[in-house]
Amino acid sequence: AALKAGGAAVTVDRAGGRTRGALVVAEMTFAVLLLTGAGLLLKSFVELQRVDPGFNPRGVLTFDMALPRARYAKPEQSRAFFTELDRRIEALPGVETAAGVFGLPLSDFNYSISIEKLDGGPAYDHPGNARSTQLRVITPDYFRTMDVRLLDGRALDETDRAGAALAVVVNESASKLLWPGDDPLGHSLELGTSFGLGGARAGGTVVGVVSDIKHFGLGEASRPEVFVAHSQFPVDFLSMTVKTSVPPQSLVAAIRGQLREMDSELPLDQVRTMDEWVAASVAQPRFYMLLLGIFAVAALFLAAIGIYGVLAYAVRQRSNEIGIRRALGAEAGDVVRMVVGRAMMLAGGGLLAGLLASFALTRILSGLLYGVSATDALTFAGVAILLAAVALLASLVPARRAARVDPMVALREE
């Protein structure tokens, strides 16, 4: 009753107060929208970092090697070159294993090949539509170099020579596509026309199964892949992978020296570590997360300043009213609750509007998210708690200032 009696004696600038309050609510709404988007992208980025790429990138150096067809026109020349290159690199101090692959993981290298026959019969999903997989040509030790898990059978090795029956290793996705519910070992398949064999089809037998590898991005689904030996399926381009026990970049000069001895005209292209390939694959999500995060923090700061400014102005304008309330029996705690309550009302309005807007607009982000829903409840709850905490902190100084108003000074001014 004392608070109401004191408040009735004071006239306030209601129109100006409503305008200032509306601006703060708008700032809070914008902050909620940006914070929710940034929170979703952050959670998605964390989920991406947890994805198993199907290989171990640590300590692996990579570079591209393309042989000019004018000087390496025959398949046996390509076989001999990459066999010797593997041998020379593996002999270097600090190198554990080395191998080449036609299609490095996370490099967006895409080479699809049709599967024309399975176990002697047609390999069609329906008439006229052949199944297809990604083709990977590798040299021995590739799976060991990249630490790819062998799930069944054997890996491709030196016994898979030119002229011998074509040996094929498939990944889990290819196994499920081509022989669902069955063990693929020992099954035969015929690969479609390929430049690797001069346009001829290649029939082979499955000798091993490996785990899926994320070739097209950590957030992308793994695709069916078949692996064949370079000695049996010669190509003139491979990405070399080198597993090292020393810092990978420290071996670049030695590798370049070995290559110069083999062919001084061949360059060492795209020299990177697999850790760099992994980092590059999440560079875009990281950029979006940081950009939205910066704007969100700025919006949150402006909203906090807005709440502080509105409350500080209101306390100055209503100091006489507050003093009268105190003189009529209001406690300091009552005054603090009044000021903080005003802050919570402003924050609540902005929070409600912001969450409703976020619920509608964050669906636009769904294409950028991995492993998290665009309406993730934990993210929305976290943003609500953060905004409430910021509003509370922003109101503390004006609230304490209001609680220290001297009622005797206010009564003399009245």
What residue ranges belong to the model's regions?
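Hydrophobic alpha-helical transmembrane segments of multi-pass inner-membrane transport and secretion
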Residues: G16-L42, P285-N320, G348-G349, A353, ...
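Nucleotide-cofactor and metal-assisted catalytic machinery
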Residues: L40-L290, E413
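Intracellular coupling helices
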Residues: A1-V10, I305-L346, R401-R412
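Alpha-helical transmembrane segments of integral membrane proteins
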Residues: A1-Y72, M408-E414
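Membrane-helix entry/capping segments
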Residues: A8-V24, Q232-F237, R256-G257, E261-A299, ...
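Short juxtamembrane loops and helix-capping segments at transmembrane helix boundaries
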Residues: A2-V12, E47-V60, A330-A332, A357-I385, ...
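Transmembrane alpha-helical interface segments in multi-pass membrane proteins
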Residues: A299, N320-S366, G382, L386, ...
